[in-house]
Amino acid sequence: MSKTLSVDKSQLRSPWSTYWTLTKPKVVALMLLTSVVGMSLAPHEHFTWHQALIALVGIALMAGSAAAFNHLIDRRIDAKMARTYRRPLPKGDVSPFNVLLFALLIGSLGFLSLMLWVNSLTAYLTFASLLGYAVVYTLYLKRATPQNIVIAGIAGAMPPLLGWTSITGELHPHAWLLVMIIFIWTPPHFWALAIHRKEDYAKVNIPMLPVTHGVEYTKTSILLYAILLALVCMLPVLVGMASYLYLFSALVLNVCFVRYAIKLKFRAEERTAIEMFRFSIYFLLLLFCALLLDQQLAL
């Protein structure tokens, strides 16, 4: 009787829910927020809501495609790691071939949307980001060097630039400054998780920094990056992109982030690393929300 009532949850899972999970929707949502900030800060001479919405859909589709490719390429190591063994492919919820078709389909739709109804620059930059994450990072760098996150971080840092170019059709130093913030944020964000999951990464021979250089070295690197991030976050104020609301928010958030890094380095407890990882997500979310609100209040 109990066996009859005990139904595997994976059997009840909708195929749509499975494919939705493959796109890493929470990650994509954060990327879209940073894209919206890029759009908001860009000159608005040629702005239309129609174009902005299509741009966001196109960026989301290609980001989801990159995430699905990541699931596909990493399916064997995901099956061996405690953090990822319940993902759709290791659980058998979907076949690798179907994931490949899904990734190609939504990636193609995203690229065509950007190319036909936004502009070619945004389409090609988004495609380059997809290749950078799905191929260069996931297929090669992740398994090749402990600096994988640093080198490939540019791919995940591109959304503000994509938002900017979707409105203007051109590159601008202010957009690259937003990219720099995410680029510097990425290593301490991922290294905190890597410390918490060090044994997992070691088990599948992924050369994350704590595995190859030790936890203490990684903690020092996180602290240095946190300090550098605090400095970089002040640049939007110095170049006139943001005002006092952003300045206050950035100061508070960076003080908290650096305090986490100091605690991790000198007074770490068992869960300090994972707590810093989780805070880093809220850090980026709140920082870009502050930048967006600051810009809207200045209008």
Curated annotation (Swiss-Prot):
<feature type="transmembrane region" description="Helical">
    <location>
        <begin position="27"/>
        <end position="47"/>
    </location>
</feature>
<feature type="transmembrane region" description="Helical">
    <location>
        <begin position="244"/>
        <end position="264"/>
    </location>
</feature>
<feature type="transmembrane region" description="Helical">
    <location>
        <begin position="175"/>
        <end position="195"/>
    </location>
</feature>
<dbReference type="InterPro" id="IPR044878">
    <property type="entry name" value="UbiA_sf"/>
</dbReference>
<feature type="transmembrane region" description="Helical">
    <location>
        <begin position="273"/>
        <end position="293"/>
    </location>
</feature>
<feature type="transmembrane region" description="Helical">
    <location>
        <begin position="97"/>
        <end position="117"/>
    </location>
</feature>
<keyword id="KW-1133">Transmembrane helix</keyword>
<keyword id="KW-0808">Transferase</keyword>
<keyword id="KW-0997">Cell inner membrane</keyword>
<comment type="function">
    <text>Converts heme B (protoheme IX) to heme O by substitution of the vinyl group on carbon 2 of heme B porphyrin ring with a hydroxyethyl farnesyl side group.</text>
</comment>
<protein>
    <recommendedName>
        <fullName>Protoheme IX farnesyltransferase</fullName>
        <ecNumber>2.5.1.141</ecNumber>
    </recommendedName>
</protein>
<feature type="transmembrane region" description="Helical">
    <location>
        <begin position="149"/>
        <end position="169"/>
    </location>
</feature>
<dbReference type="GO" id="GO:0008495">
    <property type="term" value="F:protoheme IX farnesyltransferase activity"/>
</dbReference>
<keyword id="KW-1003">Cell membrane</keyword>
<comment type="similarity">
    <text>Belongs to the UbiA prenyltransferase family. Protoheme IX farnesyltransferase subfamily.</text>
</comment>
<dbReference type="InterPro" id="IPR006369">
    <property type="entry name" value="Protohaem_IX_farnesylTrfase"/>
</dbReference>
<dbReference type="InterPro" id="IPR030470">
    <property type="entry name" value="UbiA_prenylTrfase_CS"/>
</dbReference>
<dbReference type="GO" id="GO:0005886">
    <property type="term" value="C:plasma membrane"/>
</dbReference>
<dbReference type="InterPro" id="IPR000537">
    <property type="entry name" value="UbiA_prenyltransferase"/>
</dbReference>
<keyword id="KW-0350">Heme biosynthesis</keyword>
<dbReference type="Pfam" id="PF01040">
    <property type="entry name" value="UbiA"/>
</dbReference>
<dbReference type="GO" id="GO:0048034">
    <property type="term" value="P:heme O biosynthetic process"/>
</dbReference>
<feature type="transmembrane region" description="Helical">
    <location>
        <begin position="53"/>
        <end position="73"/>
    </location>
</feature>
<feature type="transmembrane region" description="Helical">
    <location>
        <begin position="222"/>
        <end position="242"/>
    </location>
</feature>
<keyword id="KW-0472">Membrane</keyword>
<feature type="transmembrane region" description="Helical">
    <location>
        <begin position="121"/>
        <end position="141"/>
    </location>
</feature>
<keyword id="KW-0812">Transmembrane</keyword>
<comment type="pathway">
    <text>Porphyrin-containing compound metabolism; heme O biosynthesis; heme O from protoheme: step 1/1.</text>
</comment>
